[in-house]
Structure formats: C-alpha cells, structure tokens
Design a protein with these regions (language model features):
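A structural signal for conserved, well-ordered secondary-structure elements
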Residues: 1-367
Length: 367
C-alpha cells in the first residue's frame, strides 16, 4: 500500500503533468469529460442532513442485527485465534496453494468431525513449500490427535509427489528431504495473545486517526464523527461475516488477513471523510453568513461525484478479484468490497451528520 501510494503520488505530480503539457502543446486544448458525463453529479442538491434521523435509525438497526448475530452465531474464527496446528510441508515439485487446498478439502470433507473445519494454505518460501494451518482437533494436544492430523495430510497430499512417498517418510524428513519440515501447535495462550493483539491494533488505529482528525481540523466534533463512522464500518463488516458464514459459497474465516482487511477499510474510508470535512471547512470560511446546515449539505453535494467515482473504481477492481480470483483470497476481498460500500455510505450518512449535529449543538460553524 505504501509503495502504491508513493508511486501514485509521483505519477500524479510528474508523469501526469508531462503528459498533459504534451497534449496541450500539440493540440492546444484538452478535455477531461464527455458530453454525457460533463454535468453528471455536478449539480446535485441532495438533502443529506434531512435524512439524518433515518440514517441513525438504520445505523442502530444494523448494529443491533450485527450484535445479535455475533452473540448467537459468533464468528468463524481461524486457527490463529482458536488454536490449532501449523505445518510446513515440502514437495518435490512446484505446487500451487489452490491445488493443495482442493486436495485437503476433498479429504477433510470425508471426516464427519472435520467437514466444517477451516484450514489455511499459503506458499512458504520456495514454490515447492506450503504452510498449512488447521483447526482440526485444536483442543486435543495428545500424540494420537497429532498422528491423526498427520495421516489426513498424508492422505490428501501424497498424490502431489512425483514418487510414492511413504507415510513414515512424509512425517520424518531424516530419510527423505520432502514431507513435513516443521509441525507446531498453536496453544490457547498463543491464540489469546494474537486475539488481543488484533483487538488492540484496531483500537489503536481508531484512536490514532481520531487524534489526527482533531489536530488537522482543530475541532473534536470532526474527530468524533469520523471515528464513530470508522467503528461503525468495522462492526458492520464483522456482523456480516458473523451472519453470512456458512451461507456464502466461499470461506468467511476471521483470521489475520481479515484483521488486515479491517485496518485497510479504516484507512481507506477516512480518505473520503477527510475530503468532505476539508470542503466543509472551506465553505465555512468562504460563506460565513450561510447557515451551517446549508454549508454542510453543499459540501457533501460538491464532493459527491469524487466520492462515487473513487469508490466505484475501487469496487469494480475488488469485484473482479472476488469473482475471478482464487478461493484463498475471496474472504479477504469480500471484506474489502463490503467495507468500501459501507464506508462510502457512512461518510455521507454517519460521519458528517454526527459532526454537524455536534457543531450545531456547540454553536459552531460561523467562525
């Protein structure tokens, strides 16, 4: 993300300028729109603040449904947060993570107590090494349970080798360089530490962004609106994962990738919110005699085109990956796509109305 941001900044400042200057020098003029899109959303006059009561009701209902689902169904927690076993397995040829995942799924589905157990497959180092994390019998630390998991892995993966590897050689690399290189148990204490680490990372990001907004706009009302909207976004995504896991045709597991998605959503959404708040601050300076409500509504309408275009292009890319990408990243991409949609709506109907309401209560807006 950092590399992408820096690259985009460099291209916007230098490359785009050179291209525009080249076009202008050659043809004398340049157009940034078509006739059909020239005034698209340019003269919008939506009364966003007039719908604030409705938006608050919808927000409360959505949060209530999310909380009920979380209390009743819970979340499909990954092995990082519940405990489990982590393996690094070496093959004698390059293999794909999706290929390994499909083999594991076929074998695990044949075990009655393992049919709904989630597992994670990632390339580890070389193309012929995979890291596999499974929750199967995570609460059983006996040697018998470990041997059973080893046997399941062998049954699933021995066909991917170019020679008939035995179960003993698969478990022990002293006689064969291929097979299980490392096998670790993720105990309850480690899982608990990782759970709290994930929670603190999200809370810290919200606090840091709240402080940044307070310092940038010098009004706590903006920070309150922004952080409330960000927390709402995170809770809605978590609620949808709780409500929909087991119903959608792909895995909605809450793992470290999901936490990364939540943090990405928080960072992405705040961009839209800052753009709107910047325009509100600008209008308050340019039109100090206008009513605060009018300035805020005008700011929302003025930035609406930018908000929709930015979110729309991002969403198109995410949907393409969601539908045509690999199974292992669909849960992560689904969380991002959902976060983009919810984040856009929360900027318009949560963050700004809350900031406006607090500013109005304090008698601000005409300074």
């Amino acid at each position: 993300l950092i590399i992408g941001i820096l690259t985009s900044l460099f291209c916007s400042i230098f490359i785009t300028r050179l291209l525009i200057e080249g076009v202008v020098n050659k043809w004398g003029k340049i157009s940034f729109s078509r006739k059909w899109s020239e005034n698209l959303m340019g003269n919008a006059h939506f009364d966003f603040l007039g719908k604030s009561k409705i938006s608050y009701i919808v927000m409360i209902v959505v949060l209530a449904v999310s909380c009920v689902s979380f209390a009743v169904r819970g979340l499909n927690m990954g092995a990082e947060f519940t405990g489990g076993r982590a393996y690094v397995i070496r093959f004698d040829r390059p293999v794909q993570a999706e290929e390994v995942r499909m083999k594991l799924q076929d074998v695990f589905s044949g075990y009655e107590d393992a049919a709904n157990v989630s597992f994670e497959v990632k390339q580890y180092g070389n193309e012929n090494q995979m890291r596999i994390v499974t929750q199967y019998k995570y609460d059983d630390t006996s040697d018998e349970a470990t041997s059973e998991v080893d046997r399941i892995l062998y049954d699933a993966l021995h066909g991917l080798y170019g020679y008939p590897i035995t179960f003993e050689n698969f478990r022990n690399t002293q006689n064969d360089i291929n097979g299980i290189l490392t096998a670790d148990k993720i105990g309850p204490s480690i899982a608990k530490d990782m759970t709290w680490g994930a929670i603190w990372s999200v809370l810290f990001s919200l606090i840091a962004i709240g402080l940044y907004i307070s310092l940038r706009f010098k009004k706590w009302q903006y920070a309150t609106g922004a952080t409330t909207a960000l927390a709402f976004n995170a809770l809605v995504v978590i609620g949808v994962f709780s409500l929909c896991y087991g119903w959608l045709p792909f895995n909605l597991e809450v793992n470290q990738a999901f936490i990364a998605a939540i943090l990405t959503i928080i960072g992405y959404t705040i961009n839209d919110t800052v753009v709107v708040f910047d325009r509100i601050r600008e209008y308050l300076v340019l039109y100090p005699k206008r009513d605060l409500r009018e300035n805020v509504n005008n700011a929302l309408n003025a930035t609406l085109s930018r908000t929709i275009n930015t979110s729309g292009t991002t969403l198109v890319t995410l949907l393409a990956i969601l539908f045509f990408g690999g199974e292992t990243i669909r849960g992560f991409i689904f969380a991002l796509a959902l976060g983009v949609v919810v984040g856009t709506l929360s900027t318009l109907f949560v963050a700004t109305p809350i900031a406006y309401g607090l500013m109005k209560r304090e008698g601000l807006g005409k300074k």
